Amino acid sequence: YYLGDLNETHFKQSKPLGGISFRKNFDRRFAFKSSLIYSMLYAHDKNSSNAEHVNRNLHFRNYIIDLSGQIEFNFLPYEIGNPKYTWTPFVFTGVSIFNHNPETENDNGEWIALQPLGTEGQGTPFYNGRKKYALTQFCLPFGGGMKIAINKDLNMIFEYGIRKTFTDYIDDVSTTYVGVDYAAQEFTSESIHLNDRSLDGPKMQGDDRGNRLTKDWYSFSSLTLSFKLNNKEKGCNPSN
């Protein structure tokens, strides 16, 4: 799930993910993990408990590809194949690079990429300070979970992790409306409609569309079956 202008509640509007990971245990306390995760983030204002957000009537989906490197710390000694050290809670942090491309569904049922449209005036002469956001960016992952050794070669890992991003455009919503009069000069008719879908009619230029003071976050929870192969651990992540 994601946290931002269209969703302010943890675990709400969650979607499945899939991925693969590689883990190198340095000792019983520390490990390095790299992972590749693919997921879809989604939110719709109609699911909000905030009446202003419901009236804003925006929604998006965003397919995320997340490549991460992390350092894990085990609170208890942990070693697969050693009956003395069969479970531990752990925490992790690291760095990720992710690719994203927010889309919205138009009235014809087609999903339209939002970044090229500059829905808040990005890349237009009137809003010189608003540049089009990058579709590949860095973020900071951190979280924790539990490791349980099933046998000498297999373990099960549950983890919850959240990503702190440095963009407010996971959902393509951040600042203000451009206004109908200005939009008519710069945008196609579809761009104008996707910029402002308010139920009570078009907003004025400068009206708040999102909260520019906060950045977006996204989060994963996963259950991993990890196995040893040639003294290395590899895993496959099903999730909810």
Range-by-range predicted roles:
Residues 12-16, 63-67, 87, 136-140, ...:
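Residues that define the transmembrane beta-barrel architecture of outer-membrane proteins
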Residues 96-214:
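Outer-membrane beta-barrel transmembrane domain signature
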Residues 29-32, 79, 152-156, 232-234:
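Repeated loop/turn-to-beta-strand initiation elements of outer-membrane beta-barrel proteins
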Residues 1-23, 102, 216-222, 226-232:
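Short glycine/proline- and aromatic-enriched beta-strand/turn motifs that initiate or cap beta-hairpins
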Residues 2-9, 52-60, 78, 126-132, ...:
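Extracellular loop and loop/strand-boundary signature of outer-membrane beta-barrel proteins
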Residues 2-8, 42-47, 80, 100-105, ...:
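Outer-membrane beta-barrel proteins
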Residues 20-24, 67-75, 93-95, 142-148, ...:
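Residues on the lipid-exposed face of transmembrane beta-strands in outer-membrane beta-barrel proteins
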Residues 30, 36-116:
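Gram-negative (and chloroplast) outer-membrane scaffold detector with strong preference
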